[in-house]
Amino acid sequence: MKMNKLVKSSVATSMALLLLSGTANAEGKITPVSVKKVDDKVTLYKTTATADSDKFKISQILTFNFIKDKSYDKDTLVLKATGNINSGFVKPNPNDYDFSKLYWGAKYNVSISSQSNDSVNAVDYAPKNQNEEFQVQNTLGYTFGGDISISNGLSGGLNGNTAFSETINYKQESYRTLSRNTNYKNVGWGVEAHKIMNGWGPYGRDSFHPTYGNELFLAGRQSSAYAGQNFIAQHQMPLLSRSNFNPEFLSVLSHRQDRAKKSKITVTYQREMDLYQIRWNGFYWAGANYKNFKTRTFKSTYEIDWENHKVKLLDTKETENNK
């Protein structure tokens, strides 16, 4: 029988917000611009930029595809955002007796925003809408005259008139993708835990049982094990909750040629870590999940040179937000 000595959680004792931010040096790698002439109308310019936060274990890999189309009166940039966002997973202490906790990667957010007034707008993006598939796959195609098409799969929807195409392909087991804060200046996505199987599941971040609370990662309701050993095995947790998320998102930006030749964009990668805890009340185990308990955000700001089809990393910023 477990002793009925319960350790008060940090949630109950303090919900104060700790905000820590820092501006890192604007260091990164940018590849030389490669040029590909499709025909007498369309020329493609491609460069890749990387920026990392070693502190947060977040890596941004951005591929800039400039499309110069003589049959279209605007410049087009297809930006592919890839890289890595670590979950921030912290495993429980196996020696915890009647109360224990872990931190897990519950949601990953990516956004691309234009900092220009009206010269640069976001005109398309992928993926769109809500997507609960295990594997998300889209193909973007550009045809002469500025026509953009986005189709499901890695090749569907392309035809002989396609001057440029780009694909995205990522896995999100037990998670789902949502569009967020999307307008003509910003496109964003959130990949969040949705249906996690654990015995009586599926469970989510907000699941609740009147007796056992949120059993998201609880191994046994009546287990005689120590608290720190009464979580499901780490390998049974979804990969995104305990390891890394490898994003692949597309944004299409349009630039008016009669306006400023340079503009700025900001790319944001973020993880939301939830606090999950279990406690013994003398009769059974109960779990609780506290959403967005720790947030780690990494931003990079780039200057886009539309005339010369180049990019320059201006600044990076790391922000911590703890409850």
UniProtKB/Swiss-Prot annotation:
GO terms for biological process: cytolysis in another organism. Keywords: Cytolysis, Hemolysis, Signal, Toxin, Virulence. The keyword Amino-acid biosynthesis does not apply. Pfam families: Leukocidin (PF07968). Residues 1-25 form the signal peptide. GO terms for cellular component: extracellular region. It comes from the Bacteria. GO terms for molecular function: toxin activity. Leukocidin consists of two protein components: F and S; gamma-hemolysin consists of two protein components (H-gamma-I which is identical to F and H-gamma-II). Belongs to the aerolysin family. Leukocidin causes cytotoxic changes in polymorphonuclear leukocytes. Gamma-hemolysin causes hemolysis in red blood cells. This is Leukocidin-F subunit.
